[in-house]
Amino acid sequence: IQIGARNMQNFALLKRAGRARKPVLLKRGMSATLEEFLMAAEYIMSEGNYQVILCERGVRTFADHTRNTLDLSLIPAVQRLSHLPILVDPSHGTGKRNKVTPLSRAAVAVGADGLMVEVHNNPDRALSDGIQSIYPDQFDELMKQIRQIAAVVERYLPEPAASPSQNTVPAAARP
């Protein structure tokens, strides 16, 4: 179950998700503090569901160079205060394809437990999220870079089952 940023403080929904006994991905609200984010997770767990994964996806600021501002300082703060795993969504966290790779690398370096990245074989024709989606071959390259960073910060990444870069628009054909 994924609870998006706009529903992070929908307490009835959080409690219901807690009763579902399914893993819940909880995205941080657009202006939520660290405490509010963790307390939203508590609503889910108060119903007996401890399968909660947190996701930092950016907060609203006055910056105009990006759609949201990805708060990577949240990662070590959550890890200091909670046992819950925390992912980073650099796609929604920036809203811009060219920022996904560098912020993914930074998220891994700061200790994120995982990434949620938009990947599309032809982002310019995607029905949604195309502007923030990377191409499959870019994802392949990102994973190579992330593996190197993960090794430096002593994190483990499982080996992929298969490469997602099949059936993609060749780099030369991109706008």
Where in this protein do the model-derived segments appear?
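Catalytic beta/alpha-barrel core
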Residues: 1-11, 23-34, 53-57, 65-66
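Surface-exposed amphipathic alpha-helical tracts and adjacent flexible/coil segments at the periphery
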Residues: 143-175
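Glycine-rich phosphate-binding active-site loops on the catalytic face of alpha/beta enzymes
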Residues: 4-9, 109-132
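Surface-exposed amphipathic alpha-helices with a cationic face
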Residues: 18, 41-45, 76-82, 143, ...
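Active-site loop-to-helix "anion-binding N-cap" substructures in soluble metabolic enzymes
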Residues: 7-19, 153
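Active-site/ligand-binding-proximal alpha/beta "capping" segment
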Residues: 43-110
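C-terminal helical cap(s) of enzyme catalytic domains, especially alpha/beta-barrels
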Residues: 122-155
